[in-house]
Amino acid sequence: MLQFFIMNKSNHSNILIIGGGCAGISVASRLKSLKSDLTISVIEPSDKSLYQAAWTLVGAGAYEKANTIKPMSSVMPNYVNWIKSYAESFLPESNTVKTSNEEYTYDYLVVCPGLKLNFDGVAGLKESLGKNNVCTNYDADMAVYTWECLKNLEGGNLLFTEPPMP
């Protein structure tokens, strides 16, 4: 059974979530539906919400890139305390997360900051993307290019790669 503690501190939340993407917002919504009196804070620096899952549809020509980008304020639930900053360090021994100018405490911490792409991890990939039919759906602009390449495909072999799961 989950136990929560009330503290007289404005920077304290029952649930502190790092990351305001699909995972962070889904977790916030699910937990709030299970226990409506939870205090939930989300540390998310971005003004934009990127619906990355739809980029495969953009790359297939079935969805518009513009529909995958929305103001963060339009998707962040109104019951969430949105902390518009980066999490800079974790202090688990004191249930604390530090940002550049503040400390936040929590009863439970959820860490889902999203992907950090590393196109430099494959020799020559970064320089090749966006030309000569080298595409990726891990970037909204490149997903548009994927569709351009597929529309103009006249034959040949296609090579698809998928990174292994951790």
Each model region followed by its residue ranges:
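N-terminal functional modules and adjacent low-complexity/disordered segments of proteins
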Residues: 1-2, 26
